[in-house]
Curated annotation (Swiss-Prot):
Lineage of the species this protein comes from: Eukaryota, Viridiplantae, Streptophyta, Embryophyta, Tracheophyta
Gene Ontology molecular function terms on file: RNA binding; rRNA binding; structural constituent of ribosome
Residue ranges of coiled coil: none
InterPro entries: Ribosomal_Su5_D2-typ_SF (IPR020568), Ribosomal_uS9 (IPR000754), Ribosomal_uS9_bac/plastid (IPR023035), Ribosomal_uS9_CS (IPR020574), Ribsml_uS5_D2-typ_fold_subgr (IPR014721)
Name of the protein: Small ribosomal subunit protein uS9c
Entries under Gene3D superfamilies matching the protein: 3.30.230.10
Main subcellular location of this protein, as a coarse class: plastid
Location of the transit peptide in the chain: 1-51
Classification via PROSITE patterns: RIBOSOMAL_S9 (PS00360)
Positions with biased composition (Basic residues): 194-208
Length: 208
Protein backbone atom coordinates (compact mmCIF):
# COMPACT_ATOMS: atom_id res chain seq x y z
CA UNK A 1 0.00 0.00 0.00
CA UNK A 2 1.57 3.17 -1.12
CA UNK A 3 1.10 6.43 0.68
CA UNK A 4 1.76 9.54 -1.28
CA UNK A 5 3.79 12.41 0.16
CA UNK A 6 1.12 14.88 -0.76
CA UNK A 7 -1.48 13.10 1.39
CA UNK A 8 0.90 13.12 4.41
CA UNK A 9 1.61 16.81 4.11
CA UNK A 10 -2.07 17.59 3.86
CA UNK A 11 -2.84 15.57 6.99
CA UNK A 12 -0.10 17.33 8.97
CA UNK A 13 -1.33 20.68 7.84
CA UNK A 14 -4.80 19.91 9.14
CA UNK A 15 -3.48 19.42 12.71
CA UNK A 16 -3.60 22.48 15.01
CA UNK A 17 -1.27 23.01 18.01
CA UNK A 18 -2.44 24.97 21.04
CA UNK A 19 0.17 26.76 23.16
CA UNK A 20 0.17 26.06 26.90
CA UNK A 21 2.38 29.01 27.78
CA UNK A 22 1.46 30.83 30.95
CA UNK A 23 0.23 34.36 30.58
CA UNK A 24 2.51 37.25 31.39
CA UNK A 25 2.48 37.93 35.15
CA UNK A 26 0.87 41.15 36.26
CA UNK A 27 3.03 43.68 38.03
CA UNK A 28 1.78 45.28 41.26
CA UNK A 29 1.78 49.05 41.36
CA UNK A 30 4.46 50.41 43.75
CA UNK A 31 3.97 53.57 45.70
CA UNK A 32 6.54 56.17 44.76
CA UNK A 33 8.58 57.56 47.61
CA UNK A 34 9.90 61.04 47.83
CA UNK A 35 13.56 61.34 46.93
CA UNK A 36 15.97 61.95 49.83
CA UNK A 37 17.40 65.41 49.90
CA UNK A 38 19.95 66.94 52.24
CA UNK A 39 18.35 70.35 51.91
CA UNK A 40 15.22 69.25 53.81
CA UNK A 41 16.32 66.96 56.65
CA UNK A 42 13.79 65.25 58.91
CA UNK A 43 13.01 66.92 62.22
CA UNK A 44 14.49 64.92 65.13
CA UNK A 45 13.11 65.48 68.62
CA UNK A 46 15.81 66.24 71.21
CA UNK A 47 16.54 63.52 73.78
CA UNK A 48 15.40 64.58 77.24
CA UNK A 49 17.10 62.91 80.23
CA UNK A 50 15.65 63.38 83.69
CA UNK A 51 17.65 62.54 86.79
CA UNK A 52 16.49 62.38 90.38
CA UNK A 53 18.48 64.15 93.04
CA UNK A 54 20.86 61.94 95.01
CA UNK A 55 20.36 61.31 98.72
CA UNK A 56 23.98 62.12 99.57
CA UNK A 57 23.32 65.85 100.27
CA UNK A 58 20.51 64.87 102.66
CA UNK A 59 22.80 62.49 104.55
CA UNK A 60 25.52 65.15 104.71
CA UNK A 61 23.01 67.64 106.10
CA UNK A 62 21.85 65.15 108.74
CA UNK A 63 25.46 64.45 109.74
CA UNK A 64 26.17 68.19 110.00
CA UNK A 65 23.09 68.67 112.17
CA UNK A 66 24.11 65.81 114.47
CA UNK A 67 27.63 67.23 114.70
CA UNK A 68 26.23 70.59 115.80
CA UNK A 69 23.97 68.82 118.29
CA UNK A 70 26.86 66.83 119.79
CA UNK A 71 29.11 69.89 120.06
CA UNK A 72 26.33 71.82 121.77
CA UNK A 73 25.84 68.98 124.27
CA UNK A 74 29.56 68.44 124.88
CA UNK A 75 31.22 71.83 125.41
CA UNK A 76 34.98 71.43 125.43
CA UNK A 77 34.86 68.09 123.62
CA UNK A 78 34.91 64.53 124.90
CA UNK A 79 37.91 64.97 127.18
CA UNK A 80 36.23 67.77 129.17
CA UNK A 81 33.29 65.60 130.25
CA UNK A 82 33.00 64.00 133.68
CA UNK A 83 31.12 60.77 132.90
CA UNK A 84 33.37 59.16 130.31
CA UNK A 85 34.55 55.60 129.72
CA UNK A 86 37.09 54.11 127.34
CA UNK A 87 36.70 50.67 125.80
CA UNK A 88 39.04 48.66 123.60
CA UNK A 89 38.65 45.51 121.52
CA UNK A 90 41.21 44.18 119.02
CA UNK A 91 42.40 47.35 117.24
CA UNK A 92 39.28 49.41 118.01
CA UNK A 93 39.16 52.19 120.61
CA UNK A 94 35.93 53.87 121.74
CA UNK A 95 35.48 56.85 124.05
CA UNK A 96 31.98 57.08 125.49
CA UNK A 97 30.25 59.99 127.21
CA UNK A 98 26.97 59.59 129.12
CA UNK A 99 24.51 62.41 129.74
CA UNK A 100 21.00 62.37 131.09
CA UNK A 101 18.59 62.39 128.18
CA UNK A 102 16.02 60.41 126.23
CA UNK A 103 18.06 57.46 124.94
CA UNK A 104 19.84 58.87 121.88
CA UNK A 105 22.86 56.87 120.74
CA UNK A 106 25.26 58.76 118.48
CA UNK A 107 28.50 57.25 117.14
CA UNK A 108 30.92 59.50 115.24
CA UNK A 109 28.17 62.09 114.68
CA UNK A 110 25.83 59.48 113.16
CA UNK A 111 22.90 57.53 114.53
CA UNK A 112 23.97 54.18 116.00
CA UNK A 113 21.63 52.16 113.77
CA UNK A 114 22.93 53.88 110.65
CA UNK A 115 26.59 53.67 111.70
CA UNK A 116 26.37 49.96 112.55
CA UNK A 117 24.46 49.29 109.30
CA UNK A 118 21.41 47.99 111.15
CA UNK A 119 23.24 44.84 112.27
CA UNK A 120 21.16 43.43 115.16
CA UNK A 121 24.14 41.74 116.86
CA UNK A 122 26.27 44.91 116.87
CA UNK A 123 23.32 46.98 118.09
CA UNK A 124 22.80 44.45 120.88
CA UNK A 125 26.46 44.83 121.91
CA UNK A 126 26.20 48.60 122.38
CA UNK A 127 22.82 48.57 124.14
CA UNK A 128 23.37 45.64 126.52
CA UNK A 129 24.98 47.64 129.39
CA UNK A 130 22.12 50.16 129.49
CA UNK A 131 19.49 47.43 129.09
CA UNK A 132 21.02 45.46 131.99
CA UNK A 133 20.38 48.37 134.34
CA UNK A 134 17.12 49.47 132.71
CA UNK A 135 18.53 52.81 131.50
CA UNK A 136 17.65 52.54 127.79
CA UNK A 137 15.74 55.85 127.81
CA UNK A 138 17.49 57.59 130.71
CA UNK A 139 20.81 58.52 129.12
CA UNK A 140 22.08 59.94 125.85
CA UNK A 141 25.26 58.21 124.67
CA UNK A 142 27.92 60.00 122.61
CA UNK A 143 30.72 57.89 121.17
CA UNK A 144 33.92 58.62 119.28
CA UNK A 145 35.29 55.36 117.84
CA UNK A 146 38.19 54.59 115.52
CA UNK A 147 40.34 51.65 114.46
CA UNK A 148 39.38 48.10 113.59
CA UNK A 149 36.07 47.12 112.07
CA UNK A 150 32.49 47.70 113.05
CA UNK A 151 32.31 44.49 115.08
CA UNK A 152 35.36 45.41 117.15
CA UNK A 153 34.12 48.97 117.58
CA UNK A 154 30.72 47.74 118.78
CA UNK A 155 32.34 45.57 121.46
CA UNK A 156 34.67 48.40 122.45
CA UNK A 157 31.65 50.70 122.82
CA UNK A 158 29.97 48.13 125.05
CA UNK A 159 32.94 48.12 127.42
CA UNK A 160 33.14 51.92 127.32
CA UNK A 161 29.45 52.31 128.22
CA UNK A 162 29.81 49.84 131.10
CA UNK A 163 32.84 51.70 132.48
CA UNK A 164 31.04 55.03 132.15
CA UNK A 165 28.08 53.64 134.12
CA UNK A 166 30.48 52.84 136.97
CA UNK A 167 31.22 56.57 137.26
CA UNK A 168 27.50 57.27 137.56
CA UNK A 169 27.17 54.96 140.57
CA UNK A 170 29.41 52.36 142.18
CA UNK A 171 26.36 50.17 142.81
CA UNK A 172 26.27 49.36 139.10
CA UNK A 173 29.39 47.21 139.39
CA UNK A 174 27.69 44.03 140.65
CA UNK A 175 25.05 43.62 137.89
CA UNK A 176 27.47 44.66 135.15
CA UNK A 177 30.18 42.30 136.38
CA UNK A 178 27.68 39.46 136.66
CA UNK A 179 26.91 39.85 132.95
CA UNK A 180 30.62 40.00 132.09
CA UNK A 181 30.37 43.53 130.71
CA UNK A 182 33.37 44.86 132.65
CA UNK A 183 35.83 42.26 131.36
CA UNK A 184 38.27 43.41 128.69
CA UNK A 185 38.39 40.81 125.91
CA UNK A 186 42.13 40.56 125.29
CA UNK A 187 41.93 38.18 122.33
CA UNK A 188 43.70 39.51 119.25
CA UNK A 189 44.87 38.02 115.97
CA UNK A 190 47.94 35.82 116.42
CA UNK A 191 50.98 37.07 114.52
CA UNK A 192 52.35 35.34 111.45
CA UNK A 193 55.52 33.29 111.94
CA UNK A 194 58.49 33.16 109.55
CA UNK A 195 58.54 29.99 107.48
CA UNK A 196 54.78 29.50 107.87
CA UNK A 197 51.99 30.67 105.62
CA UNK A 198 49.94 32.14 108.50
CA UNK A 199 50.08 32.06 112.29
CA UNK A 200 50.15 28.25 112.41
CA UNK A 201 49.52 27.00 108.88
CA UNK A 202 52.64 25.34 107.47
CA UNK A 203 53.40 24.77 103.78
CA UNK A 204 52.55 21.36 102.39
CA UNK A 205 55.09 18.68 103.37
CA UNK A 206 56.60 16.51 100.67
CA UNK A 207 58.71 13.54 101.75
CA UNK A 208 60.42 13.20 98.36
Amino acid sequence: MAVSISSLTSSFASLSFTSNLTPKPQTLPMARTKPFSLSNPAVVKPLVITATSATAPVEVAETADLEKFVKSRLPGGFAAQTVIGTGRRKCAIARVVLQEGTGKFIINYRDAKEYLQGNPLWLQYVKTPLATLGYETNYDVFVKAHGGGLSGQAQAISLGVARALLKVSASHRAPLKQEGLLTRDSRIVERKKPGLKKARKAPQFSKR
